[in-house]
Amino acid sequence: EVTVQGVGGHGALPHMAADPIVAASGLVLALQSIIARNVDPLDPAVITVGSFQSGALATIIPGEARLNIGVRTCTRGTRELIRKRIETLVSMQAKAFGCEAEIIYNPGISYPPGYNTPEHAKLVHDVAVELGQDPARVEMRGPFMFSEDFAFIQEVVPSCYFGLGNGKSRSLHDSGYDFNDELLVKGPVFWGR
């Protein structure tokens, strides 16, 4: 979580404030430069700003802005590089607009990438095809970037992470998601194979 602390004020007097929204907005854009210019393009990494909160009124410059940032990498080295670059950009972006910033890390949400072993992925693929699934929809090559507890198991036990899908409805993280009750029958059949 990043908090950009500015100086609030009236929207008609921006020269008497330090606008944290402007500083944080610039930061959102600058964060993408880390992936584009600091990370090896052959080393998968993602930075997501999943939440941006600030202010409540159209005519008031708020005193602070908060960003929640998610980082996904496949290597610890890249994760550390991104962490250092985020710290630098947060500090510099805040200072550029007369603000200050604080970063709070939650180390409990740092997950390793997951990897499917070829033999287990083939087993899942074969069962999916046997059950009438589209083979193209069950392929998962390379690491996956989800924050998934199962990745800790995969560090020790060769395995395959997969999803059954939800049919034609919206996907899991969509606000309109509706669980497909047919999965209550399909899931156990799949696992039983």
Language model regions located:
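Fold-level recognition of mixed alpha/beta catalytic cores in primary-metabolism enzymes, strongest
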Residues: 1-29, 33, 42
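Metal-dependent amide/peptide-bond hydrolase catalytic core
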Residues: 25-193
